[in-house]
Curated annotation (Swiss-Prot):
Positions annotated with a glycan in the UniProt record: 2, 51, 70, 165
Function comment: Lectin involved in the quality control of the secretory pathway. As a member of the endoplasmic reticulum-associated degradation lumenal (ERAD-L) surveillance system, targets misfolded endoplasmic reticulum lumenal glycoproteins for degradation.
Domain of life: Eukaryota
Disulfide bonds: 116-132, 193-223, 208-235
Keywords, alphabetical: Disulfide bond, Endoplasmic reticulum, Glycoprotein, Lectin, Membrane, Signal
GO cellular component, one term: endoplasmic reticulum lumen
UniProt: a mannooligosaccharide derivative binding residues: 127, 139, 194, 200, 219, 225
Signal peptide start-end: 1-18
Compartment annotation: Endoplasmic reticulum membrane
Protein name (record): Protein OS-9 homolog
Amino acid sequence: MNWTSLVYLWFIFKSIFADLTSHQLKSKVVFLDTTISDEVARSYLGSEDGNVTHGNYEILSIANGANDGNITSYLCQLPRTKKMAPTKPKPTMSVHELKSRAIDLISESFVEGTSCVFSFNLHANYWTIGYCHGINVIQFHENLDDFISGIHKPHSPNHVYTLGNFSKQTSPLEFEFDTKERTISQRLLGEVCDLTGEPRTIDTIYRCDHILEIVELTEIRTCQYELHINVPKLCSLPEFKRTNLEEGVSEILCTRIE
């Protein structure tokens, strides 16, 4: 599927699924590895008087090229907008055991590759945030070229701020597990803030996702921060896996029409 098709797809879904946005739902399009005949697909759209016989369906046509006129059509089932209560997994271990296992998985994630991850232009569209597991969390300003190169050269060496330092010994007692958000967090103390005269604090919040990365840094109060980090290995624990329903994501299932 080329960029022309993707743009075309976006505008079609933006139009036919506009009613979903009013319910503050996010939609994920899933193209099924199955096919359906045109006759059967049309039957799912309802009778000529407009009565829907099999649910809420639309036919989506995607242009495969810019000018070749080749079009692929799909029968797409729109998600129902009624609210459903997400089911929570049954605990597989005690909270203490869960936190211990999560801590190990987080540590393993950084041992396998590098101990540090960086995110450019994250905080106020100015700062680079560096998370070095077991060492510290820092913020500094750098040029885009330095970020891309991986050298991470601060533009002003005297303005590298330590938001938090890790302790030498990590204990599960330092961590909080949020059953609702399915996250685990740890509070770190950093260097003294010149505005408050107190140490900077940062809550590092880890969650299950498919890419190891810094997602967001928020300054809640002066020199008090929240850092959100995605850790794929946490997804191996059911207590950290979030369903589409919990994420506010509904699937639009599309089957190719032959």
